[in-house]
Design a protein with these regions (language model features):
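A conserved beta-strand-loop-helix scaffold within acyl/acetyltransferase catalytic domains
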Residues: 85-166
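Short, small-residue-biased leader/transition segments that mark boundaries at the very start
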Residues: 1-6, 275
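Conserved GNAT acetyl-CoA-binding A-motif
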Residues: 17-26, 186-194
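Short, glycine/charge-rich beta-strand/loop segments that flank catalytic centers
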Residues: 20-37, 48-50
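Acyltransferase donor/substrate-recognition loop-hinge adjacent to the catalytic core
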Residues: 39-110
Length: 275
């Protein structure tokens, strides 16, 4: 099929460019298919990159004792900001969103490279809202945006790419989560709030919403026979002995590399290389 054609093209490219074949963000259910194609794989399934999956109906209702904490935070937010309302966001709301980013950065206290990069990516994604394929929504308090989310509906799963709220407005996050799920998740079975990237605070928060599953995103490194060798082998023939290089071989190796006359026998001329 077409998938096999793509796999062959990828293999050819990696062979021609001497690039290691690495496949990332592979859903767990796709692993058997890759193992059939490449039986020698090194797999990585890091906890930091597992996606948090929730039932859409749970996020939209927060029903039952297990969600009493979220409901309490929402009630406090509604009491503190009685005029707050959820609104869908479109490309026409870009000025409102830009003002939100300005307010958000005033309260943003994380200094790590990853945190700053994630914020930059979130802002870049928001600029794509006018293209029409993103779902956007936010909380307005007196015509000021205090929280916003960006998502996609992919095959019955609502994937939340961005979820931001002003820290000064306590309870804004659970209020946003519930309102966004209620508005956009009606035809969805699951809501994917993506990974926590190893951030402790984010992990604690996402676990408090009681995910039904942590979905792995596998990383495969395709290997060859040579990758199975634990050490460089010693090969002996009547005329040749091949052994691993040692420190004492440095002078002889350098002399060989700089011997132009001898190197011509191997099909290359180092004198033609200009630095």
């Amino acid at each position: 099929g077409l998938g096999d054609v793509y796999k062959r093209q990828i293999e050819s490219y990696c062979t021609d460019t001497e690039t290691p074949l690495v496949i990332s963000v592979v859903p767990e259910e796709k692993a058997p298919e890759l193992l059939l194609r490449w039986p020698r794989l090194r797999m990585n399934n890091e906890r930091n990159w597992k996606d948090y999956l929730y039932r859409a109906e749970d996020m939209a209702a927060f029903a039952g004792r297990k969600y009493s904490g979220q409901r309490n935070h929402i009630n406090k937010f509604r009491k503190e900001y009685p005029t707050a309302k959820f609104v869908p966001l479109t490309g026409a709301d870009m000025p409102l969103i830009e003002n939100f980013w300005a307010d958000y950065e005033q309260e943003f206290q994380k200094t790590s490279f990853n945190a700053k990069r994630e914020l930059a990516y979130a802002k870049a994604l928001a600029r794509l809202l006018p293209e029409g394929w993103l779902l956007g929504g936010g909380l307005l308090v007196d015509d000021r945006l205090v929280a916003m989310s960006l998502a996609e509906n992919c095959g019955g799963t609502l994937i939340i790419h961005v979820e931001k709220a002003l820290y000064s407005h306590q309870g804004a996050y659970p209020t946003l989560v519930q309102a966004f799920a209620a508005h956009f998740g009606g035809d969805c079975v699951y809501i994917n709030r993506e990974d926590d990237a190893g951030d402790r605070g984010l992990r604690t928060s996402k676990l408090q919403y009681l995910p039904v599953r942590l979905a792995g995103k596998l990383r495969f490194e395709v290997q060859c026979e040579a990758d199975r060798l634990r050490e460089i082998p010693t090969v002996t023939t009547p005329r040749l002995t091949l052994t691993p290089l040692e420190e004492r071989d440095e002078a002889a190796y350098n002399a060989l590399c700089l011997d132009d006359a001898r190197n011509r026998w191997w099909g290359y001329d180092l004198s033609l290389i200009h630095i």
